[in-house]
Amino acid sequence: MFIIIKSTEKKQYVNFAHGGFTMEYRIKKIQSKADIDLCNEFEITNYKWRNVYTPKVVGKMGFIPGEGIFAKMTCFEENPLALKTQDRDRVCDDSAMEIFLAFTEEGEKLSNDIMYINFEFNSNAKMYAKYGKGRKGRTFISEELCKECGCTVTKDEKSWTATVLFPIKFLEETCNAGKLDVGSQFYCNFYKISETPEIEHYGSFSPIGTETPNFHVPIYFAKAIIVE
């Protein structure tokens, strides 16, 4: 069953096939990172489970041929918790934003055991980034790849903005994305989180239908489509 919600920037589809709510995000093809503000905006509005507060988060994502998928996210919060200072640290204990991308191989059905990437970053621009099929036995990206992703953060008094690149070679060769171009489809979700009790919160772009906190559920991801 699908219900279309009209929008000036993107179409959203309600899909109850998996007992969840699936939306659609259109990833614009752009020429460079400088064009990211031309892309469609998404907003994290679905907060559930335990939330001490619910910060506003918006973002944009674009496809750069030959480079990869570039994303920009802004969280409107003052003095974000940022105790983690090394890549691979559990930044979800800080105030963190996250991007998950999932890919099915030809003939493979959507499930929670498909290939997906989780890039998680705090306002120190430190990343906890893994890939793999399903939640167990996931692999950290290499230090070299982490540098190539180039996570950066800028801050002001009321917000912080992160940018990150998902390199095309990593997506196409390691993550089963196939050759990416206009018309390519996969799955995505965007998150805001802290697991520290004093500021605990769990926000997502595409709603999640689990009873307990769990972002590792591709069946609830939004459909992503690369467009002109």
What residue spans do the PLM features occupy?
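An acidic-aromatic pocket/loop used at catalytic or ligand-binding sites
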Residues: 12
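Structural preference for beta-rich elements and adjacent junctions enriched in aromatics
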Residues: 2-5, 15-228
